[in-house]
């Protein structure tokens, strides 16, 4: 099968996935690049694989590709220069409750969200829980920032306070990052079943959410008042890492 017209109905529908509302409606999203698509294939998330005419499919054994003209690939790519390999992927429909959870409240930058997801996988967490006002996980910038980790961790989006209370009932210790009324992170006990809460880039964690945290963690620094949220996440998650 070969598609050469950007006006093809399939192409029009794929192009709509560049918009969040269509990603939400269909449960699908676009992924570009050989590395990310390789990770998606490992997770069984690739529905359709699109390749530019004249190119060799690096995943020929795993997935047959639909050959597309350059103009089609440019229309579907988020990059100005286009992409030669694009996958239409399915979003995860279930996210099992994890006892090692990273919780994001109001984190707006998709690059930060993606970097935190990547860090969570690296340090052995099994669930990322996002508030409804966080950046879209399936935004192209976020997907790229995860470097494929998106496909290897449970992800869910819901109201945080009920979800955190459920985790606490399961015996999970909930730790929120804070600047006031907090103990140094290095002095807090290490727990296996842990939920680390990180807040909005400018405002931090909302008071109501912070109130239900079991502990408040302060990252000790010399002079600066705060860190980028993705950097703060890396420090906190390393503290509670699970290796192997």
Outline where the language-model segments fall:
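RNA substrate-binding interface of SAM-dependent RNA methyltransferases
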Residues: 90-180
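Glycine/small-residue-rich loop that forms an oxyanion/phosphate-binding "nest" at active or ligand-binding sites
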Residues: 65-90
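Active-site/ligand-binding-proximal alpha/beta "capping" segment
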Residues: 176-224
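Short beta->alpha connector loops at strand-helix junctions that form conserved
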Residues: 68-69, 105, 131-132, 154, ...
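Amphipathic alpha-helical repeat scaffolds
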Residues: 33, 108-116, 227-232
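Boundary-proximal intrinsically disordered activation/regulatory segments immediately upstream
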Residues: 1-55, 134-135
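Structured adenosyl-cofactor binding patch, chiefly the S-adenosyl-L-methionine
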Residues: 87, 122, 137, 142-149, ...
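Short acidic-hydrophobic, aromatic-tinged amphipathic segments that line or gate anion-handling sites
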Residues: 2-5, 66-69, 153-163
């Amino acid at each position: 099968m070969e598609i050469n017209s950007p006006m093809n109905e399939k192409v029009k529908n794929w192009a709509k996935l560049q918009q969040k509302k269509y990603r939400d409606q269909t449960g699908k999203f676009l992924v570009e690049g050989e590395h990310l698509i390789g990770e998606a294939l490992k997770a069984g998330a690739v529905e359709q694989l699109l390749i530019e005419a004249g190119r060799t499919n690096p995943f020929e054994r795993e997935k047959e590709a639909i050959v597309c003209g350059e103009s089609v690939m440019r229309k579907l790519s988020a990059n100005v220069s286009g992409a030669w390999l694009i996958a239409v992927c399915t979003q995860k429909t279930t996210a099992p409750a994890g006892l090692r959870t990273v919780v994001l409240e109001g984190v707006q930058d998709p690059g930060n969200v993606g970097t935190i997801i990547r860090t969570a996988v690296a340090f052995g967490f099994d669930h990322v829980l996002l508030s409804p006002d966080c950046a879209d996980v399936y935004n192209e910038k976020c997907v790229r920032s995860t470097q494929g980790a998106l496909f290897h961790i449970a992800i869910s989006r819901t109201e945080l306070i009920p979800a955190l209370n459920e985790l606490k009932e399961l015996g999970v210790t909930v730790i929120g990052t804070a600047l006031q009324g907090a103990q140094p992170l290095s002095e807090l006990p290490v727990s296996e079943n842990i939920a680390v809460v990180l807040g909005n880039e400018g405002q931090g964690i909302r008071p109501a959410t912070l109130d239900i945290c079991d502990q408040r963690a302060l990252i000790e620094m010399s002079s600066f008042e705060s860190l980028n949220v993705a950097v703060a996440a890396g420090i906190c998650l390393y503290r509670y890492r699970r290796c192997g």
